[in-house]
Regions:
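A glycine-rich beta-to-alpha transition motif near the start of alpha/beta enzyme domains, typified by
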Residues: 1-112, 152-271
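Active-site glycine-rich loop that binds ribose-phosphate moieties when present
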Residues: 2, 122-141, 167-169
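Membrane helix-loop-helix hairpins that form the core translocation module of multi-pass transporters
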Residues: 99-100, 114-123
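Active-site-proximal beta-strand elements of phosphoester/diester hydrolases
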Residues: 117-119, 140-145, 256
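Internal active-site segments that recognize and position negatively charged phosphoryl groups
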Residues: 133-161
């Protein structure tokens, strides 16, 4: 039995545990499955394992609640940046991920919330229709890469349903379809106006989530590329609204949103 120190934080309801990489001792998958369980663990959408390297750099490994490893999480990265701001007073930090380095800068603190601007890389957007088993007709959407894979679908209905299915049901089918070799995150986007979108997220390895930093960026990038919206907009998910700025298709996208430290403690882990 091991005693694992953790911090829990959330960004617009998308919650993560932050654990020192050394504590994982090669047990990342099992630890994520156990500690992220909502009823028998601490409960979280994933774990950010923070590796403090000898050269002073910081690197994050993200494991989803199902134990699978992902390239990065925009919200998870922001949660780590908020923890480093609170615990070490860091106002700007570069965090390495398998999806590239993400630089996070503290903008302000509003009560318990840390508002952080994150440089999210240069999105790549490709319009692509797909055919999925069990779904009638082709699905029109866009493949977007923001350091991890996304498929974005534009919808008209207020409940975000499409092709006769709820967004949750359709998202589950698309996320694991063999067309996507490593699976994909799925977003359902409604354009509300030239400066505003709303969206829902089916996250690879987690299922429906209240928010996603990379999902916010992917949804915004697709809207900016394929719909008539501004290069600066508000993107509203179930858990809250984030601000996205993307000057042009060759520039780095900037994402601004809140993160809040929930608690810290020690967990018993047998694995």
């Amino acid at each position: 039995m091991s005693r694992i120190e953790f911090v829990k934080a959330h960004a617009c309801g998308n919650d993560f545990l932050v654990i020192d990489e050394a504590a994982a001792a090669g047990r990342h998958e099992a630890m994520a499955e156990k500690l992220c369980a909502r009823h028998t663990g601490i409960g979280a959408d994933g774990i950010e394992f923070l590796d403090r390297r000898p050269d002073g750099s910081l690197f994050l490994r993200l494991f989803n609640a199902d134990g699978s490893e992902a390239e990065l999480s925009g919200n998870g990265t922001r949660c780590v940046a908020a923890w480093l701001a609170e615990s070490e007073g860091l106002k700007e930090v570069a965090l390495g991920t398998h999806g590239g380095v993400r630089t996070c800068r503290l903008m302000e603190r509003k009560g318990a919330e840390w508002w952080i601007e994150s440089a999210m890389g240069v999105p790549r957007v490709m319009s692509r229709s797909i055919v999925i088993a069990g779904v009638d007709g082709a699905i029109e959407g866009a493949m977007v890469n923001v350091g991890n894979p996304h498929y974005v679908i534009f919808v008209e209905r207020e409940d975000f349903s499409s092709h006769g299915m709820s967004w949750q049901e359709l998202g589950a089918k698309i996320s694991i379809d063999p067309l996507f070799k490593f699976g994909t995150n799925v977003e359902f986007v409604r354009v509300l106006g030239p400066h505003e979108i709303a969206f829902r997220i089916y996250e690879r390895g987690c299922g429906p989530t209240t928010s996603s930093g990379t999902g916010t960026c992917a949804s915004s990038a697709a809207a900016m590329t394929l719909r008539e919206v501004a290069r600066e907009l508000s993107a509203a998910a179930q858990g809250g609204t984030q601000r996205v700025v993307w000057p042009d298709s060759t520039s780095e996208m900037m994402l601004t949103g809140p993160a809040e430290i929930v608690c810290q403690g020690t967990a018993e882990f047998a694995g």
